[in-house]
Amino acid sequence: MYINDFYLCLSQTRCGHFADDTFIIYNSKKAKTIETVINTELKEVIKWLRLNKLSLNAGKTELIFFHSKKHSIDYEKVYIYFNGVRLNPVDHIKYLGMYIDKFLNWNQHVNNLSKQLSRANGVLSKLRYNASLDICLQVYYAIFFSYLIYGCNLWGLTTEENICKIEILQKKCIRIMTFAPFNSHTNDLFIELGIIKVRDIISMTQLSLVYDFLNECLPSDLMRLFTLSSNVHTVPRELNSTVNRHLYIPKVNTTKYGLDSIRYHCATLWNKMFKTGAVNIDGDEKNNVHLTKIKTKKHFNKTMKKHFLYSYTIDPYLVYY
């Protein structure tokens, strides 16, 4: 409640809060414009802090410029100050446990995630000799899966090379828990343990985001991420039961920041997955789960998990991207 009026001191930038973490963001292609606007806004921030008898440690305040590799910024010519201290740009920042780099390619986050998952593998490699498989699975979900799933609908948009790094670590983890040889195939092991692969974990979290959108369970800002096809195109009444849950695919201008955007990726994945309006969970069409019959989030996640596990029995390289 104490800082809910912070945004009122800003006129040209946007801000966000989570607990004691606050960010200010501004968008411009001109370095001098960025310098002028940010310096002006930071002066207003200082005034607001003084009026509210608060202080901010400039040494812990970080500055980052987001840009593509093709459009670099000469940082040395951009002077941004906070309370007399110049803020030097950094290559990446940590916000809410996510490492966000200046190119938005998630390389730094994947590197840090790899270290955490490697440590988890080390713990499991020692624990497996003194604990049952059930205990190892509990530890897997506690110290491996919990890190893996956090924010994966965002960092999952990273490069194929980065996904492969995490994929290798997950397969190693599966082999460790089951005492399987280092080069053994893992499809049967994933099915045996009831664990889905990292690529499918990413897909499931992205599909889950769309599911929440369709059921109006997202915050208002995130509800603007997607648009129903029926709100853009005229749909015949007889097709409404299926098409009214299909998403409009936005037009994109760039490959890097268009096709890899969460808006485009989630919409494309959802429409592809539910092209027929039903989900195959065991190969028998009679047991297909129709989209309109999935009433709860728990049922949705359970259905998607069954679908992905079944896919490992058909094609080991089946990926929904």
Task: Describe the function of each predicted region.
Residues 40, 55-91:
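Short, conserved micro-motifs composed of acidic
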